[in-house]
From Swiss-Prot:
This is HCLS1-associated protein X-1. The lineage of its organism: Eukaryota, Metazoa, Chordata, Craniata, Vertebrata. Residues 185-280 are annotated as: Involved in PKD2 binding. Keywords: Acetylation, Cell membrane, Cytoplasm, Cytoplasmic vesicle, Endoplasmic reticulum, Membrane, Mitochondrion, Nucleus, Phosphoprotein, Sarcoplasmic reticulum. Interacts with ABCB1, ABCB4 and ABCB11. Directly associates with HCLS1/HS1, through binding to its N-terminal region. Interacts with CTTN. Interacts with PKD2. Interacts with GNA13. Interacts with CASP9. Interacts with ITGB6. Interacts with PLN and ATP2A2; these interactions are inhibited by calcium. Interacts with GRB7. Interacts (via C-terminus) with XIAP/BIRC4 (via BIR 2 domain and BIR 3 domain) and this interaction blocks ubiquitination of XIAP/BIRC4. Interacts with TPC2. Interacts with KCNC3. Interacts with XPO1. Interacts with RNF217.
Amino acid sequence: MSVFDLFRGFFGFPGPRSHRDPFFGGMTRDDDDDDDDDDEAEEDRGAWGRESYAFDGSQPPEEFGFSFSPRGGMRFHGNFGFDDLVRDFNSIFSEMGAWTLPSHSPELPGPESETPGERLREGQTLRDSMLKYPDSHQPRIFEGVLESHAKPESPKPAPDWGSQGPFHRLDDTWPVSPHSRAKEDKDLDSQVSQEGLGPLLQPQPKSYFKSISVTKITKPDGTVEERRTVVDSEGRRETTVTHQEAHDSSRSDPDSQRSSALDDPFSILDLLLGRWFRSR
């Protein structure tokens, strides 16, 4: 007896090792059981039913199985309560749409939602309907009140954060003027005529620097040309050119004469071999 036969006998499954077994038919069919299948063919047909049981579902209540109905559904038979389980799942899935979907579809606002004051009056252009008075030629009506007669609301003062800012400790180094805190439109022409440009134009830090570049050029005749260029922070450039003759450099700097002599190959041979020829 195989493990599947023991499992089938424990749960009360009929028909051991049937080629019609939908669960264990392909797994339990061995070469040694071919002879037993021929003898038990009639018993298997009675256990699982033929065409008469395929559509009416009239199997004994102690057997377990399933059949296909003519309507295209699958029906389980047995004492395991599969019919109730499938029925419960169908009721859950049918009610799931009521939990997720809205009860009514959203509606787009129609033209009746517009108020009469917001509609374009006859003879009024699109520009006049969008701009505020007095930029537009005709004032608009809001809730029965003309735009020109409406009282302007007093602007709210800007919040003074004071020491609550993240860099309040740097206020002593870079003080913030009160004009930079206010975020509102101002008439700068009248303010300049009354107070001048001093309060508006804040002093800006200036940096001073100077750049010096020196270039020396040695010509073939030994003349040295030196260019000294000085550029300051304001962009002024000053260039000084100095020429130094060859005989002046030989008198003032003996090392330069030796270095210039080493550049000539004949001078090098004279230094190396001159002693031998002069001594002889």
